[in-house]
Amino acid sequence: MNAYQNKNITIIGLGKTGLSCVDYLLSQQANIRVIDTRKKPTGIDKLPQNIPLHTGSLNQEWLLESDMIVISPGLAVKTPEIQTALKAGVEVIGDIELFCRAATKPIVGITGSNGKSTVTTLVYEMAKAAGVKVGMGGNIGIPALSLLNEDCELYVLELSSFQLETTYSLKAAAATVLNVTEDHMDRYMDLEDYRQAKLRIYHNAEVGVLNNEDKLTFGEGENQARQTVSFAENSADYWLKTENGKQYLMVKDEVILPCEEATLVGRHNYMNILAATALAQAVGINLDAIRTALRHFKGLDHRFQLAHQANGVRWINDSKATNVGSTVAALSGLYVEGKLHLLLGGDGKGADFSELAELINQPHIICYCFGRDGALLAKLSSQSYLFETMEQAIAFLRPTLQSGDMVLLSPACASLDQFASFEKRGEEFTRLAQCLA
């Protein structure tokens, strides 16, 4: 008999991840109930009709009758109803914990405030280039549990702090916390609380890939890997060499690739490449495959992506910059020939925006702020304008554009105050760029 057969398991949250939990636990002959606090949750039409469903609230009675609760990453463990269940002795885990208990092949785990989707996809592409049967999922692409149905030799998982909170059995072959900057401060008590959730990725990890430029990423206590390697611009195992005006991606004394041969550009992307290379090498992927991937990888949608170019003006879609740290990374080392027209705004999730002030208070940067926290952002710069929507901001700035200028959407905020997702925000920016430019 398997561990879940005939157990009463309540799954909280539908959507892709919730449905993957339903499919997996049905295959394990568990007795399943599903709860979703939304009245009409996504995926309700795909739920088998014989599965009991409660919507609109958390059903405390169901929770207390459970042997186990599989909680959506979107619901905090400190929610009173969940705390009541925990105190009654009910086990509470997430989908990643279910996956880790079942997976038999090596796992590369990637978390961080910024860059994790790019690094996850890079490692995946490096493994593919080496001929490895690799599956990618977690907080990106498909739910981790769905990967169990594929013939994989390696799993590459992007993991959020929310997912790591309810994961206990991860034993990553290689793991990294890319960086730690304020994000989800509406969910965590403070930055340290958020950081500790991230550091869980190192628990029982074989190799930890550390960012030598961010000591907050270093493991501590039981959350430390058995071995570590480091990446940084200088003084690290994986580093950036500048010689005769050219830059090179390095591992120790060996050139990985001249930066000009990589399709990704910008200092923050070079750090992403170094981290991905370290992770890939930690699981045995050779440098030739790594180089092939780096020469062909085009980057991800909504991550500092060229959306449109006309009349000497570049429109850059960085809608995935949903926190301050991501926008700081985009602006650091950014060269613009003319003016930089920066679109900021949305839901800041309680973050401290002050770190942006020094970067954006420059003669060539003009800020156009919108959305729920637009007014707060507008106060940071002496050259700022405030609008209700992004569309109004773009309509206002368009007539002022000159050759050499850049329009950058790097909002430092979540999108949900005005858009269904950061992808929808990026798509709207691209549409406006192309029709108004």
Swiss-Prot record:
Pathway(s) the chain acts in? Cell wall biogenesis; peptidoglycan biosynthesis
Reactions catalysed according to its record: UDP-N-acetyl-alpha-D-muramoyl-L-alanine + D-glutamate + ATP = UDP-N-acetyl-alpha-D-muramoyl-L-alanyl-D-glutamate + ADP + phosphate + H(+)
EC number of this enzyme: 6.3.2.9
Positions that bind ATP:
G112, S113, N114, G115, K116, S117, T118
Nuclease as a keyword?
Answer: no
Q: Name one GO biological process term.
A: regulation of cell shape
Any one annotated GO CC term: cytoplasm
Signal peptide location in the record? none
Disulfide linkages recorded for this protein, renumbered to the chain, are none
Q: What class of enzyme is it?
A: ligase
Keywords on record: ATP-binding, Cell cycle, Cell division, Cell shape, Cell wall biogenesis/degradation, Cytoplasm, Ligase, Nucleotide-binding, Peptidoglycan synthesis
Q: Where in the cell is it found?
A: Cytoplasm
GO MF terms listed in the record are: ATP binding; UDP-N-acetylmuramoylalanine-D-glutamate ligase activity
The protein's job, in short, is: Cell wall formation. Catalyzes the addition of glutamate to the nucleotide precursor UDP-N-acetylmuramoyl-L-alanine (UMA).
Give the family this protein belongs to, as stated in its UniProt record: Belongs to the MurCDEF family.
This one is known as: UDP-N-acetylmuramoylalanine--D-glutamate ligase
Q: What is the lineage of its organism?
A: Bacteria, Pseudomonadati, Pseudomonadota, Gammaproteobacteria, Pasteurellales
Q: Which gene encodes it?
A: murD
